[in-house]
Amino acid sequence: FGSEIDLDIVVHLGAGAYICGEETALLNSLEGRRGEPRLKPPYFPAVKGLYMKPTLVNNVETISSVPWIIENGGEEYNKLGVEGSTGTRIFSLSGHVNNPGNYEIEMGTSFGEFVDTLGGGIRNNKKVKAYIPGGASAPWFRGDQLDIKMTIDDVANNNSMLGSGAVVMMDEDTNLVSAAKSIVSFFAHESCGQCTPCREGTTWLEMILDRIASGRGRTSD
């Protein structure tokens, strides 16, 4: 790249396990081990990471911001967004929208503005029944909460989280029980099995939601 810095870049393709989004599970996978989280402490990556060597773990979104910051400076980057949530972030928009995709936007934009301007609105001009603000594990918002700002604080103050930045819009015709079952089934399948509440709990949740979705729900459910 025209500099005096010399380094090797190796691209290692993972198998796509959800748990390997956790940094220590990712390191286990790179070492050829079972993809499951390590105990922290003592296995903080910066202390005992890949092959027990100090390791810096960053995701692609973080790295993608580095060139702009190097060129323009951190102070300029912090002028983007709002206080407490500065800069930009990459959000993945999917569901019942006209223009699904990955978008880099300034923090502080409302979910409604995001969907209307970049997402092209909801398909067939339907209303939003509910939406997921930050990935499958984030608590959902109602369709009348589109004015919530895409900031850490505003989302947290409304009892959810930005999480992975995966925004999923569900229109007025969506069966929310079936949608919840689909997500729970995903977690049941992707559980690494290390911890009992996740390993057993997600399977039970899947069975309960399956009963409700098929009309066999119980009062206790």
Q: Which residues fall in each region the model found?
A:
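Hydrophobic alpha-helical positions that pack around
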Residues: 1-107, 119
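Terminal amphipathic helices with adjacent charged low-complexity linkers/tails
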Residues: 9, 122-157, 210-213
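Structural signal for hydrophobic packing residues in well-ordered secondary-structure cores
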Residues: 30-34, 67-77, 118-123, 184-191, ...
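Short amphipathic, charge-patterned alpha-helical segments
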Residues: 107-125
